[in-house]
Regions:
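Short Cys/His-centered divalent metal-binding micro-motifs
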Residues: 77-110
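Short microdomains enriched in Cys/His and/or Lys/Arg
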Residues: 63-79, 107-125
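Histidine-centered nuclease catalytic patch
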Residues: 47-84, 99
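Cys/His-coordinated zinc-binding microdomains
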Residues: 47-49, 91, 102, 128-131
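Short cysteine-rich loop/turn motifs with clustered Cys
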Residues: 27-60, 87-89
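A boundary/linker detector
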Residues: 1-31, 124-147
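Short cysteine/histidine-rich zinc-coordinating motifs and their immediately flanking basic loops
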Residues: 53-61, 97-104, 110-114, 138-143
Length: 147
């Protein structure tokens, strides 16, 4: 029977899922405390103390990583190399900016400022140089150019 209603239908292209799930490693309470103290509870983008719940952010976006990093096995220097602290709002801003970059391979200017301390606006296999990747390093490098 035909109902006369027009509807959009999606065609299943494959029985196997295309999305490959990457397991995330949970951060223990002790490791979280260690990381928060290491970064002095300061937001990487502003340097200000975080009064709300700080979020431990992977510098390299989750969508670009092959596998998660087990932070419980890292030295303090390695933790600083792979992670930064952000407020929830800043983490959401970063997530959106990195999502646009992932789609277009064009780096979104950090907080509207078109400055990259390594590379330029074109993503070339690394996030290094982008303010969204490392807010502290980005501010330090920009300050050198201003002085």
């Amino acid at each position: 029977p035909i109902c006369g209603t027009r509807r959009t239908h999606y065609k299943l292209l494959s029985e196997e899922p295309v999305f490959v799930e990457k397991p995330r490693i949970s951060i223990t309470g002790a490791t979280r405390k260690k990381i928060l103290e290491l970064f002095d509870f300061r937001d990487a983008f502003t340097g200000a103390s975080i009064s709300s719940t700080p979020e431990i952010d992977h510098k390299e976006p989750w969508t670009r990583m092959e596998q998660d990093i087990d932070d419980s096995l890292l030295s303090p220097e390695e933790i600083k190399e792979h992670f930064q602290l952000l407020t929830r709002e800043h983490n959401l801003l970063k997530d959106r900016a990195c999502g646009k970059c992932k789609e277009s391979n064009i780096r979104t200017p950090f907080l509207g400022i078109p400055f990259w301390y390594e590379g330029d606006s074109t993503y070339c296999g690394t996030c290094r140089g982008c303010g969204w990747y490392d807010g502290v390093k980005w501010r330090e490098e920009l300050s050198k150019h201003i002085k």
